[in-house]
């Protein structure tokens, strides 16, 4: 089963050439990644989803969610012996797709959060990428008025929030 999911994740990564894909496609690729992490962490970390949009009807930057979920596992939850939780939510607010990825991990102090946001801003300007900087830069290019915001509190977890104005319709699949 693990090999099947790993192969599927590789295929998703290799065949996705477009800058924007449907949320449905993004979630499909994310499922394989989550499965592999569930095996790695022996099910200690639960992932819940609350998707209140038609995933095939909205566009997101390709490879937007996996780095955020990866950060939740790697930085927020990995060291928690009692396990943890990641909650992925999506909804429409006016004509804006709002997505949040929240974890109940170790969180960050105000100083740590400030350092992360500084790194993101620097990577946006230089083009030298850290994962979140790459995502933020692509949101700025693809979604005028789009945003990525990070909220965190030490001992309580982190939330990454995306706001993506939906001005285009997904193309029909061939």
Predicted regions span which residues?
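Two-component histidine phosphotransfer core
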Residues: 1-149, 159-161
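C-terminal end segment of the histidine kinase catalytic
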Residues: 148-174
